[in-house]
From Swiss-Prot:
UniProt EC number: 6.3.2.9
Source species of the chain: Lactococcus lactis subsp. lactis (strain IL1403) (Streptococcus lactis)
Protein's job: Cell wall formation. Catalyzes the addition of glutamate to the nucleotide precursor UDP-N-acetylmuramoyl-L-alanine (UMA).
SUPFAM superfamilies (UniProt xref): MurCD N-terminal domain (SSF51984), MurD-like peptide ligases, catalytic domain (SSF53623), MurD-like peptide ligases, peptide-binding domain (SSF53244)
Metabolic or biological pathway, per its Swiss-Prot or TrEMBL entry: Cell wall biogenesis; peptidoglycan biosynthesis
Gene Ontology molecular function, alphabetical: ATP binding; UDP-N-acetylmuramoylalanine-D-glutamate ligase activity
UniProt: ATP binding residues: G119, T120, N121, G122, K123, T124, T125
Alphabetical list of Gene3D superfamilies matching this protein: Mur ligase, C-terminal domain (3.90.190.20), Mur-like, catalytic domain (3.40.1190.10), NAD(P)-binding Rossmann-like Domain (3.40.50.720)
The UniProt record lists the keyword Ligase: yes
Protein family per UniProt: Belongs to the MurCDEF family.
Cellular component annotations (GO), alphabetically ordered: cytoplasm
The protein, known as: UDP-N-acetylmuramoylalanine--D-glutamate ligase
Length: 450
C-alpha cells in the first residue's frame, strides 16, 4: 500500500458500512485520518460497527442525522448502493464536501496496476477469467471490487508486482475522481439500474467514466459486436482494442469456429468449457486483456478449456429426484435472464423470477418465455411477472422468497424437468446482495436434497 499522507489528520465520513465501507474505514484509519462511520443498522445488530469501535473509530448507527455533516468533514466515502439523492449525500455536496466511492480510495493507495472491467452483463465471468488466466501464466492477479472483495482492502495488501483485476459497477464509477486503470474493458451496454441513475443515458455515462483519466499509454477494450460500444472507440484518449464474434478486429475475434488474437490462432471455439454466444464474448474479452499483459497462449487455453463458471451465474447445483436445479442469482436484469433461458428447453423448464421493482415491464422477456412449462414469482415484481406469464398461458405460482419457491414448486415438477433461478431483477427488495439470495437458494437445495 502506498503510504499516502493526503488523508492524515483529515476528518472523513464513511457513509454506509457493509464490506466496502468497513474496508474503507480501516484503511483510512491506518492512513491517519480521523474517521467517523455512519450506518443505518442499529449498533446491537451491527457487527461491522462493533468491530470498528474496537479499533477506536467513531461510529454513529441506527439513523443518518443530517447535522452530522456540520462537523466540517474534508471527504465523504459513500457506499456505492446509496443513491446520490440521499439527503446525507445531497447535504455533503451542498457543503462542497467531495463524495467518492471506495474504488477511488483503492486507486489512490494501490501500488499495483489495475485492470478494470465494467459493462451490463458478463462482468463477473470476464473478471474471473482474466484473473485465472494471469495466475495460470505465473503472474500474480488479485480479484477485487464488485466481485465480492473490497477494492481498498485488496489494494492495501497488494504490491507493485501484483495486478488488481477489478470488477466495477456503475454505482462505484460514479464516485471516482482520479481513478485510472492500466487496462479498462467494457463488456456491453444495455438497459439497467434505471431506478438508481434515472435514465439510460446517465447509466451509460457512469460506465464511461472508467476511461476518463486514461491516456494513449493505457488500453480500452470494447465489444465491437455492439454498435453502441463500437461508436465509443473515437471518444477516448486511450488506445482501443476490440473483441468480436462477427468480424476480424484489432484484438480477439472468432472466425469459422476458431479464435484468434489479431492473426495469431489461439484455440477452437468448441474447446471452450462454457457454452453460449455470451460466454464466447466473455472469453474473447479476457483474451485481449490477458495478451496485453504478455500472457502465453498455453495459460489462456488451459483456463478457457477448464473454467467451471462463477458461483451464482448459471451454477449447476445438481438434481433432486431427477429434477436439475440451476442457480443464476447473478441475473439481475432482463438481458441476463434472456441469455440464461437461451440454453434450455422451455418445454421442460420451470423459471423462478422476481425481485426489486425498478419500474420496467417484462415485455422484452415474452419471446424467451414462450412454451415455458411453468413459473414461480416472488418479490416486488411478482405481480408484473405473473401478468406476463398469464398473458402467455404459462402456469404461474406465487411464493414468498427464493427458498420457499424451490420447495413449493417441486411437487408441480416431474423427473426430467429443470428448475432455474434467474430472477431478471436485483435482489435488494428482500436481500442485501444477489450472493445472499443465491446462497439461500443453494441452502434450500441442499436441505431438500437430503
Amino acid at each position: 500500500m502506498k503510504k499516502i499522507t493526503k488523508f492524515k489528520d483529515q476528518k472523513i465520513l464513511v457513509l454506509g458500512l457493509a464490506r466496502s465501507g468497513m474496508a474503507a474505514a480501516l484503511v483510512l484509519n491506518e492512513l491517519g485520518a480521523i474517521v467517523t462511520v455512519n450506518d443505518g443498522k442499529p449498533f446491537e445488530e451491527n457487527k461491522e460497527a462493533q468491530l470498528l469501535l474496537e479499533e477506536g473509530i467513531k461510529v454513529i448507527t441506527g439513523s443518518h442525522p443530517i447535522d452530522l455533516l456540520d462537523e466540517d468533514f474534508a471527504l465523504m466515502v459513500k457506499n456505492p448502493g446509496i443513491r446520490y439523492d440521499n439527503p446525507m449525500v445531497e447535504r455533503a455536496e451542498a457543503l462542497n464536501i467531495p463524495v467518492i466511492t471506495e474504488v477511488e480510495l483503492a486507486y489512490l493507495i494501490s501500488e499495483a496496476p489495475i485492470i478494470g472491467i465494467t459493462g451490463t452483463n458478463g462482468k463477473t465471468t470476464t473478471t474471473t477469467l482474466i484473473a485465472d488466466i494471469l495466475n495460470a501464466d505465473g503472474q500474480s492477479a488479485k480479484l477485487s471490487g464488485n466481485i465480492g472483495f473490497p477494492a481498498s482492502e485488496v489494494a492495501e495488501k497488494a504490491s507493485a508486482s501484483d495486478t488488481l483485476v477489478m470488477e466495477l459497477s456503475s454505482f462505484q464509477l460514479m464516485g471516482i475522481d482520479s481513478f485510472r486503470p492500466k487496462i479498462a474493458l467494457i463488456t456491453n451496454l444495455f438497459s439497467a439500474h434505471l431506478d438508481y441513475h434515472g435514465s439510460q443515458k446517465a447509466y451509460e455515462a457512469a460506465k464511461w467514466r472508467i476511461q476518463e483519466n486514461m491516456t494513449s499509454d493505457d488500453f480500452l477494450i470494447l465489444n465491437f459486436n455492439q454498435e453502441k460500444c463500437r461508436n465509443l472507440a473515437d471518444k477516448t484518449k486511450a488506445t482501443v482494442l476490440a473483441f468480436s464474434t462477427k468480424e476480424k478486429v484489432n484484438g480477439a475475434y472468432s472466425k469459422d469456429g476458431k479464435i484468434y488474437f489479431n492473426d495469431e490462432y489461439i484455440m477452437e471455439v468448441s474447446e471452450l468449457s462454457l457454452p453460449g454466444e455470451h460466454n464466447l464474448e466473455n472469453a474473447l474479452a479476457a483474451i485481449v486483456a490477458s495478451k496485453l499483459q504478455g500472457t502465453k497462449n498455453e495459460a489462456i487455453v488451459e483456463v478457457l478449456t477448464s473454467f467451471a463458471g462463477v458461483k451464482h451465474r448459471l451454477q449447476y447445483l445438481g438434481e433432486i429426484d431427477g429434477r436439475k436445479v440451476y442457480n443464476d442469482s447473478k441475473a439481475t436484469n432482463i438481458l441476463a435472464t434472456q441469455k440464461a433461458l437461451s440454453g434450455f428447453d422451455n418445454s421442460k423448464l420451470w423459471l423462478l423470477a422476481g425481485g426489486l421493482d425498478r419500474g420496467n415491464g417484462f415485455e422484452e422477456l415474452e419471446k424467451d418465455l414462450q412454451d415455458l412449462k411453468g413459473m414461480v414469482v416472488f418479490g416486488q415484481t411478482a405481480n408484473k411477472l405473473r401478468l406476463t406469464a398469464e398473458k402467455l398461458n404459462i402456469p404461474v405460482f406465487d411464493s414468498e422468497n427464493v427458498a420457499k419457491a424451490l420447495e413449493e414448486i417441486l411437487p408441480q415438477t416431474q423427473a426430467g424437468d429443470t428448475i432455474l433461478l434467474s430472477p431478471a431483477c436485483a435482489s435488494w427488495d428482500q436481500y442485501k446482495t444477489f450472493e445472499e439470495r443465491g446462497d439461500l437458494f443453494i441452502q434450500a437445495f441442499e436441505n431438500l436434497k437430503k
